């Protein structure tokens, strides 16, 4: 499981950073890639990676500002051009208006998609659980931005314990159907009368990962709720230390406020993105150092960077 950041800048592209987009790679878990936001130029960024567009099965949009959605119609169209590869349907989650925006762009440009796009629009009345399958659940909560904006909490369900095959062999269990029964939690009796207690040969379930990805926001308790105990918290850092007033007026956060959220949420790691173009080189180092005075495990991500979870 990895995060890869396709765009880490704020507002508009710069020479160092493209606008907002990242992917959560779940290839080992479910053979899928999930995208979060799709700003202008996202598909160009993908060309610099190993990401295959057909593997992108779900797209989660945080809000309707252009730097988070202007790349979406183009990405969907390019995904359709992969005619030599199997086409699979795609799900788009986002605020009310995302369906109209995408479909209007598709229709007016004469684009034809070779797959179906299923939309799940989110409003004040549909916050909470927005997606669930047998491996993952995704929750959304409203943040505090200048327009309706959400953050997402991706929860991997606990993984089943593993079967200790060597211990079973040592106990005299023949390889075959009995292994499957024991793996399913069934106690078995061998031909010689030996009773095998399944739980003695299965490790404890492994706790699933929690990944929190926030959209643009002022400092808010919703960010803490979404980030509670997260293995990774992705939080915007449009502004730096001392910029709290201007950050609030523009609906954004500083690095220090993001660090406070991570601390209050007891997150394990804080990844800062959505960085203003005015922060370069030495400024980035200071921004990270300042945030670490509040939350030590802080890192400012750069475009195309991969982070293992």
Swiss-Prot record:
Binding site for Zn(2+) 1: 63, 65, 145, 216
EC number(s) per entry: 3.1.26.11
Cofactor binding remark: Binds 2 Zn(2+) ions.
Pfam families, alphabetized: Lactamase_B
Superkingdom: Bacteria
Binding site for Zn(2+) 2: 67-68, 216, 274
Biological role: Zinc phosphodiesterase, which displays some tRNA 3'-processing endonuclease activity. Probably involved in tRNA maturation, by removing a 3'-trailer from precursor tRNA.
Protein name per its UniProtKB record: Ribonuclease Z
Species in which this protein is naturally found: Streptococcus thermophilus (strain ATCC BAA-250 / LMG 18311)
């Amino acid at each position: 499981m990895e995060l890869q950041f396709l765009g880490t800048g704020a507002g508009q592209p710069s020479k160092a950073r493209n606008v907002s987009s990242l992917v959560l790679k779940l290839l080992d878990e479910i053979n899928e890639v999930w995208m979060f936001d799709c700003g202008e130029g996202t598909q160009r960024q993908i060309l610099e990676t190993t990401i295959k567009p057909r593997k992108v099965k779900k797209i989660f949009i945080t809000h309707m500002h252009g730097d988070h959605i202007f790349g979406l119609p183009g990405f969907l169209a390019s995904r359709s051009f992969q005619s030599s590869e199997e086409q699979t349907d795609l799900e788009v989650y986002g605020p009310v208006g995302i369906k109209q925006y995408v479909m209007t762009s598709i229709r007016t440009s004469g684009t034809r998609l070779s797959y179906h796009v299923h939309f799940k629009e989110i409003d004040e009345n549909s916050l909470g659980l927005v997606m669930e399958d047998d491996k993952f659940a995704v929750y959304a909560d409203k943040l505090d931005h200048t327009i309706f904006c959400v953050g997402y909490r991706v929860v991997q369900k606990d993984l089943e314990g593993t079967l200790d095959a060597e211990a079973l062999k040592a106990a005299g269990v023949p390889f075959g159907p009995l292994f499957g029964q024991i793996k399913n939690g069934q106690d078995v009796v061998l031909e010689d009368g030996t009773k095998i207690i399944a739980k003695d040969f299965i490790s404890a379930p492994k706790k699933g990962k929690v990944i929190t990805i926030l959209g643009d926001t002022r400092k808010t308790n919703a960010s803490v709720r979404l980030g509670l105990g997260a293995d990774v918290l992705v939080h915007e850092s449009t502004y730096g230390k001392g910029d709290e007033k201007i950050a609030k007026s523009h609906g954004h956060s500083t690095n220090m406020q993001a660090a406070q959220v991570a601390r209050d949420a007891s997150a394990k790691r804080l990844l800062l993105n959505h960085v203003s173009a005015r922060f370069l080189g030495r400024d980035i180092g200071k921004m990270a150092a300042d945030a670490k005075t509040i939350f030590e495990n802080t890192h400012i991500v750069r475009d195309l960077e991969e982070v293992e979870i």
